[in-house]
């Protein structure tokens, strides 16, 4: 497919000046965005737009969403993780929320970076502390310019080219550490640490491998028996120990595969990074799982320890000269779900057990089980006790099942309410995962996803998005449903921006076939903005998520057409040179804390964001 010009739904000029406050940040109430945008969930649907490659700029319109800022997320900083949205779930708590500013429909534009090297548009994006985008590339990992017309590689690591290996980097659970090193599990059961920048933050053309540990071999030595599961996920705890879990995206208990949970001691990692010899037999500790039990998701970590959800249980683990299981809480599952007679889908779910990675708050662990109906559970962080539980998405139309596979959004307001947004994923999973010879740890589209969904779009997945609040009371906790959207089918791993107060997604209008960016009101669940992309099937983003840029003005969405989309606001213009457009990739919006404002010499109270161009 050929490259094309940016897609516009509005003109290029704003009623705000460069280096001033954006009008969205200053105004208390503004009209919803117009043109191809839908003002609310109950309003008349937007007119069908032409396919993206045929779209041309339309006449200017005014309007933007009012800011509904929330308190920043309650995530204590991990001293061993990068101070950025450093993993696929944005932080070590797996909140799938960001404190970054995201677009508000201020003369919105969609820009495209076209992929000419990789087999797909970047399916995962993490940012280091310098603002570099770290993405998968040809089975390896790279730092790339995602805003260039053609996605440009600045530096990379190729297992085949640089390490003589046939393995792949497993990108889903790769992350950035506090020194901006890339920490990544591999398909051959190793964990690597890669140095990608120099001391000044300049990108190295070829990344340096500074650590390489065969986790499977070390774990087998510690366990004293063979492991028949593969390495799935890794994360640092708050003491710098590297936790790992074996498993896959679907683990059948009856197959009796042997798996483990465990960690590599921080002291051993530091010794290796310092060029010293270390005895891994004294530094790798494991917790043997019952045969048939394994992880199916990522690991969360807080000062309390590492939280791991297997297909059977939820664990809180600590490093204490060995793996200390602080608590283990079992949960319900009816097993892997697949489409049956009378269903409107052909695929199924993904996991055998709970499908979403566990998410933490300072006091709770949140996850969904895989019962029928599916339940949202809240566990006490200290004891593992189930303190609240409620069915979710239990009133869908006939012909649809429920599988919560995408990580839930969890937002703790710091005042006793934890809001969880769950999204149905059923139908997107490959029914072939039930094949006894299938390796569900292989992270490829062909292995994981239903072919009919890839070709026919979101008509082939079940709908359902719901917000449930867990509220602290005098007697404990109670859960209540706040809103439900049974008309939305989303597989894009929705994101919450605390800076704007909105939920961001990517859906397909099943009437027009149009793939769209969508913004929901966090409080009401109403659709307050849509922006059309294309009605061609290849604009399915294939459940690989959306990613928030660190400029305060970019929401990235990969597609199947080798195009990485980014939604941006034209929030700034040059009043004395109106014929010249400001490069939106050189404009930024950041939440300015009162403390930082005072340190920078500001007087008075911060009224808005800091906008620069």
Spell out what each predicted region is.
Residues 409-536:
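Loop/turn-rich, solvent-exposed surfaces of beta-rich toroidal or solenoidal domains
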């Amino acid at each position: 497919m050929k490259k094309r010009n940016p897609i516009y739904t509005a003109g290029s000029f704003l009623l705000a000046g460069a280096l001033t406050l954006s009008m969205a940040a200053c105004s208390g109430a503004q009209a919803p965005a117009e043109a191809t945008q839908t003002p609310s969930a109950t309003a008349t649907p937007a007119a069908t737009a032409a396919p993206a490659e045929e779209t041309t700029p339309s006449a200017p319109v005014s309007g933007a969403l009012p800011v509904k800022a929330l308190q920043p997320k309650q995530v204590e900083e991990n001293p061993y993780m990068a101070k950025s949205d450093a993993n696929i779930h944005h932080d070590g708590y797996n909140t799938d929320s960001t404190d970054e500013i995201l677009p508000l429909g201020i003369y919105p534009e969609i820009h495209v970076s076209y992929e000419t090297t990789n087999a797909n548009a970047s399916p995962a994006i993490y940012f280091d502390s310098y603002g570099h985008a770290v993405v998968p590339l040809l089975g390896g990992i790279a730092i790339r310019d995602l805003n260039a017309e053609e996605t440009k590689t600045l530096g990379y690591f190729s297992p085949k080219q640089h390490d003589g290996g046939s393995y792949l980097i497993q990108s889903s659970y790769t992350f950035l550490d506090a020194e901006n090193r890339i920490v990544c599990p591999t398909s051959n059961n190793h964990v690597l640490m890669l140095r990608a920048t120099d001391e000044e933050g300049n990108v190295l053309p070829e990344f340096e491998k500074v650590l390489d540990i065969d986790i499977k071999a070390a774990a087998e030595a510690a366990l004293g028996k063979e492991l028949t599961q593969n390495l799935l996920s890794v994360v640092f705890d708050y003491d710098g120990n590297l936790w790992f879990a074996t498993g896959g995206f679907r683990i059948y208990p009856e197959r009796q595969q042997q798996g483990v949970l465990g960690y590599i001691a921080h002291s051993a990692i530091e010794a290796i990074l310092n060029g010293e010899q270390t005895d891994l037999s004294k530094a790798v500790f494991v917790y043997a799982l019952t045969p048939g039990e394994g992880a199916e998701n990522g690991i969360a970590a807080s000062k309390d320890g590492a939280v791991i959800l297997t297909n059977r249980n939820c664990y809180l683990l600590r490093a204490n000269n060995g793996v200390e299981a602080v608590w283990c809480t079992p949960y319900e599952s009816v097993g892997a779900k697949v489409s049956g007679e009378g269903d409107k889908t052909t695929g199924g779910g993904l996991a055998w057990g709970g499908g979403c990675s566990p998410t933490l708050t300072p006091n709770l662990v949140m996850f969904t089980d895989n019962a029928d109906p599916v339940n949202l559970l809240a566990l006490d962080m200290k004891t593992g006790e189930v303190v609240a539980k409620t069915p979710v998405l239990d009133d869908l139309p006939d012909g649809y099942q429920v599988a919560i596979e995408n990580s839930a959004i969890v937002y703790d307001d710091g005042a006793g309410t934890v809001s969880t947004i769950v999204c149905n994923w059923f139908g997107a999973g490959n029914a072939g995962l039930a094949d006894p010879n299938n390796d569900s740890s292989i992270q490829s589209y062909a292995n994981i996803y239903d072919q009919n969904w890839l070709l026919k779009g979101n008509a082939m997945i079940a709908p359902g998005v719901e917000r449930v609040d867990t509220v602290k009371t005098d007697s404990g906790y109670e859960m209540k449903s706040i809103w439900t959207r049974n008309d939305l089918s989303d597989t894009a791993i929705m994101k919450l921006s605390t800076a704007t107060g909105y939920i961001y997604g990517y859906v397909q209008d099943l009437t027009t076939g149009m793939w769209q960016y969508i913004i929901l009101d966090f409080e009401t669940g109403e659709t307050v903005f849509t922006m059309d992309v294309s009605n061609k099937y290849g604009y399915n983003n294939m459940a690989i998520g959306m990613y928030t840029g660190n400029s305060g003005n970019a929401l990235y969405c990969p597609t199947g057409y080798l195009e990485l989309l980014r939604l941006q606001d034209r929030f700034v213009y040059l009043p004395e040179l109106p014929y010249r457009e400001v490069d939106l990739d050189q404009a930024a919006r950041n939440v300015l804390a009162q403390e930082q404002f005072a340190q920078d010499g500001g007087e008075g109270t911060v009224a808005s964001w800091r906008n620069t161009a």
